[in-house]
């Protein structure tokens, strides 16, 4: 939760507090929250009724741990958010075609009860549809399908426009996806 107390901390302290955080929620006007990605899936949530937002970094590990659903639960607790009234944007990230994974990642999704016949595809190796996994999570949490906008932009395929750690290397740049309440 990004509250005014966090904003009053020295920058170095704020950096330590936020290190490794994959989701932020706030209802503080004028504060931009966001996540940096380079193939992982950025998700923005907006609750117009309670003027609250969330920014989520959904890598495969966070997706397996259901970070989108957990963030919605946090918004519900902190702000009284009704998931049915949320608006969601699933930003640019790696696509099913390009997200090749090992058996251990496939098994992690299977063990987390994801519908493997819908989200996975066997080519030479397994491929996982990370954007779809997160869209399913949003819907399972109560977000209406018509309130979810997926950009359907693959960072791996469009690495000239968007950063891709898989294609350009781990030291590639990062995409910052942010949201501010005015």
Residue ranges and their predicted role:
Residues 1-182:
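Active-site microenvironment for binding and transforming phosphate-containing groups
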């Amino acid at each position: 939760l990004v509250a005014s107390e966090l904003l009053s901390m020295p920058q170095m302290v704020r950096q330590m507090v936020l290190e490794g955080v994959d989701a932020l929620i706030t209802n503080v006007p004028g504060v931009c929250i966001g996540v940096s990605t380079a193939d992982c899936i950025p998700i923005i949530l907006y609750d117009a009724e309670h003027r609250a937002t969330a920014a989520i970094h959904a890598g495969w590990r966070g997706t397996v741990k259901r970070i989108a659903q957990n963030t919605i639960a946090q918004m519900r607790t902190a702000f009284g958010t009704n998931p049915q009234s949320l608006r969601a944007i699933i930003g640019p990230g790696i696509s099913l075609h390009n997200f090749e994974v090992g058996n251990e990642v496939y098994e992690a999704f299977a063990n987390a009860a994801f519908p493997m016949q819908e989200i996975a595809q066997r080519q030479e190796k397994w491929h996982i549809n990370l954007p779809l996994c997160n869209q399913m999570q949003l819907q399972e949490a109560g977000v209406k399908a018509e309130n979810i906008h997926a950009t359907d932009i693959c960072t791996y395929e469009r690495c000239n426009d968007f950063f891709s750690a898989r294609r350009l290397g781990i030291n590639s740049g990062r995409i910052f996806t942010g949201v501010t309440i005015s």
